[in-house]
Design a protein with these regions (language model features):
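Extracytoplasmic/secreted cell-surface and envelope-processing proteins
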Residues: 95-99, 195-197, 214, 314-316
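His/Glu-based metal-binding/catalytic segments typifying zinc-dependent metallopeptidases
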Residues: 114-171, 175
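M16 family metallopeptidases and their MPP-like homologs
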Residues: 1-9, 21-30, 35-64, 82-90, ...
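Non-catalytic, conformational "gating/processing" segments within enzyme and secreted inhibitor domains
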Residues: 41, 68-105, 301
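Glycine-centered hinge/linker elements that transmit conformational signals in sensory
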Residues: 101-115
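Short, surface-exposed beta-strand/loop micro-motifs that present aromatic residues
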Residues: 73-77, 127-135, 293-295
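A short, acidic, amphipathic alpha-helical segment used as a generic capping/interface helix at domain edges
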Residues: 70, 285-292
Length: 317
């Protein structure tokens, strides 16, 4: 806690460390155009956030424009005022010992002025495609399919999104990786984040690293897998997922990290993701999954597709 106090009340200037950090980042970014993974991630971020500089991978010339004094000024604006901070204490501690330390090092941090407001970073909507070709030494194509929606944040939404992504992942692994032998990796995930407007930004993402020769053959399975999961989710997969989540919940509940996350969601987002979690998981059936995907995820019509087609790099280039 003493370190927290010092970091928030006594930000000091260290030009040598700052210069070393910038040099390290510049070195990592210097050859990003030759790194297929960085090229793809930059294209993906630029597509999702429509080229917004706040979201894309920086370039070396961006670092040349960094003003260290301005960085410190921004740091002081954000970290020397505790009004916008919530501190969580989780674990096996003695309250009588902890409270005086909180009073000394946390309660004494200045708390004044207005809270910072979230900055809106627009996200691409509608049907968006970014398909490009990249030559590389070891050709590997990459595909990302994102379905995006805004919806109220609830425990039910969180559970349905998680289970839906797991069902898609099992379908993609079974068909794209095992059946077609087309993928080095194929999977799906759900992302849930409270956006600047207070609504849940929900995205369901399917992705794969593919053998370039099987890209065209594998691509339709991202959509057929989604269609199947809507119309008739695999009952065996669904039961297995529910059992895994129920078992994992009891394991997670014994960890500090779990309770920190639960408290954070409750205080910041106003959502209790613990009390009825197991009951909510147990109640999920195929119809609930289909209705969720059709009426929540797909209804807005937001679909982003980013494909990097890979070709063999010519020798000497």
């Amino acid at each position: 806690m003493q370190l927290i106090y010092l970091k928030m009340t006594a930000l000091s200037k260290d030009e040598k460390s700052a210069a070393n950090l910038l040099s390290t980042i510049k070195t990592a970014l210097a050859n990003q155009s030759k790194n297929p993974e960085m090229v793809y991630q930059d294209s993906l971020q630029s597509t999702i956030y429509m080229g917004n500089k706040m979201a894309r991978i920086p370039k070396t010339e961006d670092l040349d424009a960094v003003n260290y004094d301005r960085v410190l000024e921004l740091g002081k604006q954000m970290f020397t005022n505790a009004k916008d901070f919530t501190f969580f204490f989780v674990g096996n501690y003695d309250e009588a010992t902890l409270l005086p330390l909180i009073e000394q090092y946390i309660a004494s941090i200045p708390s004044k002025g207005a809270k910072l407001k979230n900055k809106a970073i627009p996200v691409a909507t509608g049907e968006v495609k970014n398909i490009f070709t990249k030559s590389m030494e070891n050709p590997m194509s990459q595909v990302t399919e994102i379905w995006y929606a805004k919806t109220p944040y609830t425990l039910q939404t969180s559970v349905l999104a998680d289970i839906s992504a797991r069902l898609l992942q099992m379908d993609y692994l079974r068909n794209i990786r095992e059946k077609l032998s087309a993928a080095y990796h194929a999977g799906a995930e759900a992302s849930m984040e409270l956006d600047w407007d207070g609504q849940l930004a929900l995205s369901l993402t399917g992705s794969a690293q593919l053998n370039p020769e099987k890209l065209d053959e594998a691509l339709p399975y991202f959509f057929s897998g989604l269609k199947t999961t809507i119309e008739q989710p695999n009952a065996s997969d669904l039961q297995k997922i529910k059992e895994i989540l129920t078992k994992q919940a009891s394991v997670d509940a014994k960890t500090n990290g779990y309770w920190t996350g639960i408290l954070r969601n409750y205080v910041i987002n106003g959502i209790d993701l613990h009390t009825d979690y197991v009951k909510t998981v147990s109640s999920v059936d195929g119809k609930a999954i289909g209705d969720f995907l059709k009426n929540i995820v797909l209804k807005p019509g937001n679909h982003l597709e980013v494909i990097m087609k890979a070709t063999k790099e010519e020798a000497g280039k």
